[in-house]
Amino acid sequence: MRIGVGVSTAPDVRRAAAEAAAHAREELAGGTPALAVLLGSRSHTDQAVDLLAAVQASVEPAALIGCVAQGIVAGRHELENEPAVAVWLASGPPAETFHLDFVRTGSGALITGYRFDRTAHDLHLLLPDPYSFPSNLLIEHLNTDLPGTTVVGGVVSGGRRRGDTRLFRDRDVLTSGLVGVRLPGAHSVSVVSQGCRPIGEPYIVTGADGAVITELGGRPPLHRLREIVLGMAPDEQELVSRGLQIGIVVDEHLAVPGQGDFLIRGLLGADPTTGAIGIGEVVEVGATVQFQVRDAAAADKDLRLAVERAAAELPGPPVGGLLFTCNGRGRRMFGVTDHDASTIEDLLGGIPLAGFFAAGEIGPVAGHNALHGFTASMALFVD
């Protein structure tokens, strides 16, 4: 497998497409593109048809997916607020693209358009429209009915309202649903960095009702949280007031859960009378949870740990990657541009990397597919 990436910031969409495609072909070094991922910035929304046509004419890939997004990633750069086009090309086994729709029926709803193979544990890349496709329902279905299916991707961030989204699948431009691709035979590892660090100690959930936790270790959650905060330095207490989260241990067989073992969810509310807290996930009695904080320093450290751990799991050096980073990260979180992309490139030696700023990030935690927020999710490929 060979991977090449090209990028252009030319304001003219056809010129940008031609330049990005040509650079990607050069990096592919003569390989035949089995898959193209086409990414354009939001300023190219109205020219999406021309953008796709120009890249198809230049590259003629066997399969193509992509989108228009709020900002894109190419190499070590994150292009947040400027016209840009990135083309990511990969040689290798044939890829299978698909388009999913969410259809309401008299008795409920259906996800139509593609049937995931129960026997194939191939990587699937997913790019859903946030306005017409419920990503959480698909992920719940995969976890429940098709365990072992791995999905990585990002909720497309380019549109401000229903119908604004632009999705690319082969030669079609779509405005709803989900586009994806199955990569049979691709050797990859998933990287998920949720940007948090734990505070206090892990607790067993001893009381819960759906997504409301009523007891942690026999006491109200707010009481447990107060105990933690009182033992923290003033600057740490400020983090709790601004970025408090909770982590749910995915694999309960772990004796000492660490980085990458928690599914991070936000605190949605609290009842000061009972001390109960509401979180963004249904939790069962017996689960292990730990309070977490999120800030730039924690996010930087977590990303480095996640990338280093993933690189150690690869059977060889990585040949490229696709990055889906939250549109709440970037300059908003770190105060500087290019943080996630440049950190990954520094750690992995300048691999061909592309991606976009997402409105929700998809990736597995401890083998459990999940939809995240404020996260960097990446697929790393090896030859």
From Swiss-Prot:
Cell compartment(s), UniProt: Cell membrane
Q: Which GO terms describe its cellular component?
A: plasma membrane
Alphabetically sorted, this entry's keywords are: Cell membrane, Membrane, Transmembrane, Transmembrane helix
The root-end lineage is: Bacteria, Bacillati, Actinomycetota, Actinomycetes, Mycobacteriales
Q: Which organism is it from?
A: Mycobacterium bovis (strain ATCC BAA-935 / AF2122/97)
As for family, the record states: To M.tuberculosis Rv0874c.
Entry-linked InterPro entries: FIST_C (IPR019494), FIST_domain_N (IPR013702), UCP018953 (IPR016741)
Where are the bilayer-spanning segments?
Answer: 49-69, 347-367
Task: Tell me where the signal peptide lies.
Answer: none
Protein name as annotated: Uncharacterized protein Mb0644c
Where does it primarily localize? membrane
In the bilayer, the protein is annotated as: Multi-pass membrane protein
